[in-house]
Regions:
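A short, N-terminal "cap"/entry segment at the start of jelly-roll beta-barrel domains
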Residues: 1-41
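Conserved short histidine dyad/triad with adjacent acidic residue
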Residues: 36-56, 80, 89-92
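Short, conserved beta-strand element in jelly-roll/cupin
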Residues: 54-70
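Short, surface-exposed secondary-structure edge patches
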Residues: 60, 75-79
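A generic structural signal for residues embedded in beta-strands
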Residues: 71, 88-89
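Ligand-binding loop in jelly-roll beta-barrel domains
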Residues: 81, 90-109
Length: 109
């Protein structure tokens, strides 16, 4: 990721309109800001959320609240709790997420 031509700024995530995205189960609420080619999101997964697709996009993901389980295409499963993060490159390792109890995440991609 290369960040160019971005002046100092702040974001009040409570003021960013949320969009709702249905999963195979449950839903995800995204609050999204774009800064050039960089997408920054505050995500909220409902309890019982399960992604409806495998994702090949690279991310930096930080779990703020709740618990997130990420399954990789090779069968590995990673569980994040608050304060834990993961990072993955574009087109590197397909992954999909679920959350039994719900989760709040901060994602940069």
């Amino acid at each position: 990721m290369k960040i160019d031509d971005l002046p100092f700024g702040t974001v009040d995530w409570n003021q960013v309109e949320a969009t709702t995205h249905a999963g195979a189960r449950g839903e995800a609420r995204w609050r999204t800001r774009l800064f050039g080619d960089v997408r920054v999101r505050m995500l909220e997964y409902s309890a019982g959320y399960e992604a409806d697709h495998w994702c090949s996009k690279g991310h930096f993901l930080l779990c703020l609240d709740g618990e997130l389980e990420t399954e990789l295409a090779d069968g590995r499963r990673i569980t994040l709790q608050p304060g834990m993060s993961y990072q993955v490159a574009d087109c590197a390792e397909p992954h999909r997420s679920r959350s039994r109890s719900g989760a709040r995440l901060f994602v940069v991609d």
